[in-house]
Amino acid sequence: MQGTRILKQEYFEERLYSFHSMREENRASYVLLKLEYPKMTLEEADTALQASVRENDVRGISEKGELFLILSQTDRSSLPIILARLENDGFVCHEIDTVENANTGEKL
């Protein structure tokens, strides 16, 4: 998305496929979150994420305007700390258990 660090759906899905493949080969870990940002614009959400997540975490948006975040090299044991930080910044977080296509909801 122009003016943000948020990837368009097609580019985000490419990154998600890559992370998923590496996880399947036991070469990397990640957690996928769907983020709601009820009191922010998309640009404000992007700015808040810049302060809350690491440089190597990947954000993307679906055609429906849903915001997703790939937390790279993260496992569930560290998730409570990350979720608390994001929720404190005004996000509503939903962990996605399976790799999903951000547009159709189909499993990859």
Residue ranges and their predicted role:
Residues 1-108:
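Regulatory and interdomain segments flanking nucleotide-handling catalytic cores
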